[in-house]
Swiss-Prot record:
Assembly: Interacts with APBA1 (via PDZ 1 and 2 domains).
Keywords from the UniProt entry: Isopeptide bond, Nucleus, Repressor, Transcription, Transcription regulation, Ubl conjugation
Cross-link (Glycyl lysine isopeptide (Lys-Gly) (interchain with G-Cter in SUMO2)), chain numbering: K94
Keyword tRNA processing among record annotations: no
Residue ranges, compositional bias (Polar residues): 192-209
Protein role: Transcriptional repressor that down-regulates the expression of the fibrinogen gamma chain. Represses transcription of GSK3B gene promoter via its interaction with APBA1.
Subcellular location: Nucleus
InterPro entries named in the record: FSBP, Myb_DNA-bind_5
Protein name: Fibrinogen silencer-binding protein
GO molecular function terms listed in the Swiss-Prot or TrEMBL record: identical protein binding
Segments for region (Disordered): 189-211
A GO CC term assigned to this protein in UniProt: nucleoplasm
Length: 299
């Protein structure tokens, strides 16, 4: 693994200690924005994490905040790769993944949805292949029962393997079958000549009269898949949490600006009071000086 090779200079206990130290600040560190206040807050968090990490054990080499940040990114990337491999192997990933990956999944639940979305795309493509094969067989049966003797040859690509039995979309399949039936009836009605050779010649010379099923599927399956992603409860929950974090950050930034303004006002008042006090002191000094002079003392 690329992530494992890069972080080989860190032991397993060091990785787990880093994840335990990052856990209280994960909400701030996982906020992806370019706001200056958020960037400053992230840097402050990493400085605190580096100080706490170096204070754990004296036998470990000291680590900088930038080095710990790079290790944290590599651990997240390694967790994604490991989950994807476990998904492809169809094994119980919760019992076979490494301990750092388990902690990353507990801290960032969105990591687990990375493999789910990937699997959903594979299942959707398999559904489309199965529906295409079912539509091809229905087209051949419909031509066999037609009274006009028309030979239609449908060639499938040799490198396509039959997909496993999955749940197909019946509404999409019915719509496509109706379209093909309409196109086929249009071709048959347009050829009323008794000569069968002319019909065969028209069918063989213009293969584009009946649209390819894969082109129709590419057009309609994209919209269907995007609508599935938009309605995914995990994606909606992630968007909701992100929106709440943005609102909370805006609220905190507003409080910070208000406190800064109040502090500037208090500082200005204190400076004015100090200036007035200095003026009073100077007046008292001048009065005392006049009293000490001989010409004023005689008066």
């Amino acid at each position: 693994m690329v992530g494992k090779a890069r972080s080989s200079n860190f032991t397993l206990s060091e990785k787990l200690d880093l994840l335990n130290l990052v856990k209280p600040y994960v909400k701030i560190l996982e906020e992806h924005t370019n706001k200056n206040s958020v960037i400053v807050e992230k840097n402050r968090c990493w400085d605190v994490i580096a100080v706490n990490y170096n204070a754990i054990g004296v036998d470990r080499p000291p680590r900088t905040a930038q080095g710990l940040r790079s290790l944290y990114k590599r651990l997240k990337e390694y967790a994604k790769q490991e989950l994807l491999q476990q998904k492809e192997a169809q094994s119980e990933f919760k019992s076979s993944v490494s301990e750092p990956t388990k902690q990353v999944m507990e801290m960032i639940p969105q990591i687990a949805s990375f493999g789910l979305i990937r699997d959903r795309s594979h299942i959707q493509s398999a559904n489309l292949d199965e529906t295409a094969q079912a539509g091809t067989s229905s087209l051949q049966v419909m031509v066999d029962h037609h009274p006009v003797a028309i030979t239609v040859e449908v060639k499938q690509e040799e490198d396509i393997k039959p997909s496993p039995p999955l749940v197909s979309n019946p509404q999409l399949s019915d719509t496509l079958e109706q379209r093909e039936e309409h196109e086929l009836m249009h071709v048959v009605e347009g050829s009323e000549s008794p000569s069968l050779s002319s019909v065969d010649m028209r069918m063989t010379s213009s293969p584009s009269s009946v649209p390819r099923r894969d082109e129709i599927f590419h057009q309609e399956s994209g919209e269907h898949f995007r609508s599935l992603l938009r309605c995914d409860p995990q994606v909606l929950q992630m968007l909701k949490e992100e929106h709440q974090i943005i609102l909370e950050n805006q609220k905190n930034f507003g409080l910070y600006v208000q406190e800064k303004r109040d502090g500037l006002r208090r500082r200005q008042r204190l400076e004015e009071e100090l200036l007035r006090a200095k003026i009073e002191v100077e007046k008292l000094k001048a009065t005392r000086l006049r009293r000490d002079l001989p010409e004023y003392s005689s008066l």
